[in-house]
Design a protein with these regions (language model features):
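Conserved nucleotide-sugar donor-binding subdomain of glycosyltransferases
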Residues: 72-113
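Active-site-proximal region of nucleotide-activated glycan assembly enzymes
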Residues: 117-162
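Structural motif
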Residues: 5, 104-105, 156
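Short loop/helix-cap segments at secondary-structure boundaries that form the rim of catalytic
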Residues: 45-51, 112-119, 151
Length: 162
């Protein structure tokens, strides 16, 4: 693994995704890899605080808005167009970063568009099956199919807390 460049990009829906990538980055560095994080400004600040000297690249993040009044599944459903547009932007950003950084591996923590056909791409998720409230359970097969389509674009899917 000596000298292998690994590009890690956590989802920007809070600090949890970045937080679980930090131990992975530490282990990769311990094994001789060069780790580069691609994240939005708040996550980049946290990553640099936790891993001084780590290389980071600032990229746009997706800010999901949580409603005080609507159930969260409704709030997120209403933001689906923004989520899809964000995945398209992520993919374009990654194509540019791939040329600039030439990583051998890409690790995406729930970033739907952060994979590359020519670079070994890993998708990290804690939720393979997306659960819905009981009265919307009929939508679960559709959500599962959509998530499988996303995951199938990657070379490997890791479920760290399984």
């Amino acid at each position: 693994m000596n000298g292998m460049r690994v590009l890690i990009s956590p989802l920007s829906w809070g600090f949890g995704h970045a937080g679980r990538m930090i131990p992975l980055a530490m282990e990769l560095e311990r094994r001789g890899c060069e780790v580069v994080f691609a994240a939005d400004a708040p996550l980049t600040e946290m990553i640099v605080r936790e891993l001084p000297g780590i290389k980071t690249v600032e990229i746009p993040g997706l800010r999901i808005r949580y409603s005080r009044y609507l159930p969260q599944y409704v709030s997120i459903f209403l933001q689906l167009p923004v989520i899809v547009a964000s995945a398209v932007r992520e993919h374009a950003t990654l194509r540019r970063l791939a040329k600039e950084l030439d990583p051998m591996v890409i690790i995406s923590d729930n970033r739907f568009g952060f994979c590359h056909k020519k670079i070994f791409s890993v998708y990290v998720t804690h939720q393979v099956r997306i659960a819905f409230p009981a009265f919307l359970a009929f939508l679960e097969p559709l959500a599962a199919w959509m998530h499988r389509m996303i995951i199938s674009r990657y070379d490997l899917c890791l479920v760290p807390d399984y």
